[in-house]
Amino acid sequence: MLARGLALRSVLVKGCQPFLSAPRECPGHPRVGTGEGACISTKTPRPFSEIPSPGDNGWINLYRFWKEKGTQKIHYHHVQNFQKYGPIYREKLGNLESVYIIDPEDVALLFKFEGPNPERYNIPPWVAYHQHYQKPVGVLLKKSGAWKKDRLVLNTEVMAPEAIKNFIPLLDTVSQDFVGVLHRRIKQQGSGKFSGDIREDLFRFAFESITNVIFGERLGMLEEIVDPEAQKFIDAVYQMFHTSVPMLNLPPDLFRLFRTKTWRDHVAAWDTIFNKAEKYTQNFYWDLRRKREFNNYPGILYRLLGNDKLLSEDVKANVTEMLAGGVDTTSMTLQWHLYEMARSLNVQEMLREEVLNARRQAQGDTSKMLQLVPLLKASIKETLRLHPISVTLQRYLVNDLVLRDYMIPAKTLVQVAVYAMGRDPAFFSNPGQFDPTRWLGKERDLIHFRNLGFGWGVRQCVGRRIAELEMTLFLIHILENFKVELQHFSDVDTIFNLILMPDKPIFLVFRPFNQDPLQA
């Protein structure tokens, strides 16, 4: 059955009209219209088997993939395949077969027909752990109606504009305290500046931020002495990501049956995540229950448990997922942003000028200030273009769909190669350049279905608004207080560790920035 039960020609005509754009030359593959995959064709669609592919034997493909050490370089693997096969190809690795696309117009058509309850690829070891140990799942792993029920409730509490306003003071104080952390480091080094790798500090900042929003209270992760139990949660999240990678292309049950170290470490990581999240949830909730009046927003947990729209087990599962998803992801993006600002000092000065002007105009109103920093917000989009957290976005087709004259059957996994798209000159001019202005002004006409750092549609990242606000406030305070430079001018590569991250520590220099009081 074709998308939404329409006739093939009807689907192609109606599906392509809103998305058409001028033809564009794509390096490494034949000249095509940017919207050609979504366009009407008078030809009969070609069969799925004719989509360019390295071969149908998934195990041979997987052997070659491992032999080329593709596991940590899967984003480069995608880039090479698009250069070799063109803007659409299919690949089977082990038992998993996917169709990969890169053109924004094809992406637009994919999402147009994703259906009311989109289904994405679930990480196999995560599913195996939750099923084997009978752990409750939230929106991360739920499907269909169960997913939609949870998601609609969460949208009200974590995505709606009114909810976001409640988070501003909670996240702003954490960002202010991070400035204090850097000033302590400067004082400790005694050289008038701080030089070093702040990756661990960013992990703690991100965890302090997400816990403050969820529980309405601080954990003290930015104090000089950090609670070792809280640090265990941060370490467990990293281990959970790291141990997932070897089990992506082989059945996790094999690792479980043979009790491999990878599986044992993965289980230990998830156990820590669940145990700590349960402890935090219980402790903070009962503290809140004892209070009768609140001077400040009491946090997402209290709101979810208080509105009785979700069972307590569903609330706990979703809180656990938000805690686990709010550490490495945000901290990695901030680390990359600081790196790009340090490499592009002219951009950094443009951002600083905007922030300082916004502070003056807002006159102490943080909410108003957040509306006055479009370039800063664009710089976050630009960071996610160059350094997306996820290497792909995924959707299982609800119905048959025609892309680039190929018939793709229902239930096929289609993956949008986000990293490869962001680096392709066919879709971004000067793709290697950190240029936030490309997302503003006249350039906005060229960003159709290119801003995919948080996903798209009803199944986009549930923590998107929290993360965007958290990063914007963080960068505001950094730009107001420090000039950021690289300690060593060397390129930092990217590796795949379930999320994309730097392949080595990034050493930065923070110099105090003192605004001229006459200009303040």
Curated annotation (Swiss-Prot):
Q: Which annotated residues bind heme?
A: C461
Which residues form each disulfide bond in the chain? Answer: none
- This protein's major location comes to mitochondrion
Do you know which InterPro entries this protein is assigned to?
CYP11_CYP27_families, Cyt_P450, Cyt_P450_CS, Cyt_P450_E_grp-I, Cyt_P450_sf
Enzyme Commission code(s) on record = 1.14.15.6
Q: What is this protein called?
A: Cholesterol side-chain cleavage enzyme, mitochondrial
Provide the catalytic activity annotation: 6 reduced [adrenodoxin] + cholesterol + 3 O2 + 6 H(+) = 4-methylpentanal + pregnenolone + 6 oxidized [adrenodoxin] + 4 H2O; 2 reduced [adrenodoxin] + cholesterol + O2 + 2 H(+) = (22R)-hydroxycholesterol + 2 oxidized [adrenodoxin] + H2O; (22R)-hydroxycholesterol + 2 reduced [adrenodoxin] + O2 + 2 H(+) = (20R,22R)-20,22-dihydroxycholesterol + 2 oxidized [adrenodoxin] + H2O; (20R,22R)-20,22-dihydroxycholesterol + 2 reduced [adrenodoxin] + O2 + 2 H(+) = 4-methylpentanal + pregnenolone + 2 oxidized [adrenodoxin] + 2 H2O
Q: By its UniProt entry, which Pfam families does this protein fall under?
A: p450 (PF00067)
> What does the entry give for GO biological process?
C21-steroid hormone biosynthetic process; cellular response to peptide hormone stimulus; cholesterol metabolic process; cortisol metabolic process; glucocorticoid biosynthetic process
Q: Where in the cell is it found?
A: Mitochondrion inner membrane
Cite the record's note on assembly.
Answer: Interacts with FDX1/adrenodoxin.
Q: Which family does it belong to?
A: Belongs to the cytochrome P450 family.
